[in-house]
């Protein structure tokens, strides 16, 4: 019975892309290789990052959200987020046979049918926009398709699950952020938010 279930799962994988919602490779590249793609080459096994092209393919990954995480206390969150997005864009150029940036659902399907991994960008923490709807819109134009509202700390507009509540959920500006994300078609990721924010 287990073999039959595995066969069904594999058949499903061939028809529908498995999309991994979070991969910290861009952060690992920043922290361990000074953003140098040659130092953590994805065509070779990467035991420290647990991510390489062979493993992604073997795991049946058809779509990958690359997390563009920056620390909540980063003094220049917009710049740091742009640098992380730049890493993802450079990955697409370095490995065009494996990855392509996907901006729409149709892109995901097309890339998957070509046997490549549809690559999407997820922002981990609303602090990345530095309380700017303009920054949010520009990140979307660069390919960000979800944003986690918080990470380990509150922002000026939303409470995190692991910080002392100051807003009891979303502020009026926080509601504007969510409305703008909905208008843009960005997923609102509730990981790390306080219960009141939900």
What feature does the model see in each segment?
Residues 6, 171-172, 194:
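Ser/Thr-centered flexible coil motifs
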């Amino acid at each position: 019975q287990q073999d039959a279930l595995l066969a069904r799962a594999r058949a499903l994988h061939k028809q529908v892309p498995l999309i991994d919602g979070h991969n910290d490779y861009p952060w690992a590249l920043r922290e361990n290789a000074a953003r140098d793609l040659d130092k953590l080459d994805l065509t070779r096994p990467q035991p420290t990052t647990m991510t390489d092209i062979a493993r992604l393919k073997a795991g049946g990954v058809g779509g990958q959200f690359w997390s563009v995480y920056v620390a909540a206390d980063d003094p220049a969150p917009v710049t740091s987020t742009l640098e992380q997005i730049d890493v993802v864009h450079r990955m697409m150029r370095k490995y065009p046979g494996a990855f392509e940036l996907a901006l729409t659902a149709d892109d995901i399907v097309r890339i998957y049918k070509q046997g490549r991994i549809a690559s999407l960008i997820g922002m981990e923490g609303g602090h990345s926009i530095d309380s700017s709807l303009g920054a949010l819109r520009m990140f979307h134009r660069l390919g960000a398709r979800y944003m986690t509202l918080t990470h380990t700390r509150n922002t000026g507009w939303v409470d995190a699950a692991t910080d002392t509540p100051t807003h009891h959920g979303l502020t009026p500006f926080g509601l504007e952020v969510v409305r703008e994300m909905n208008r843009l078609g960005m997923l609102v990721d509730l990981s790390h938010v306080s219960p009141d924010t939900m």
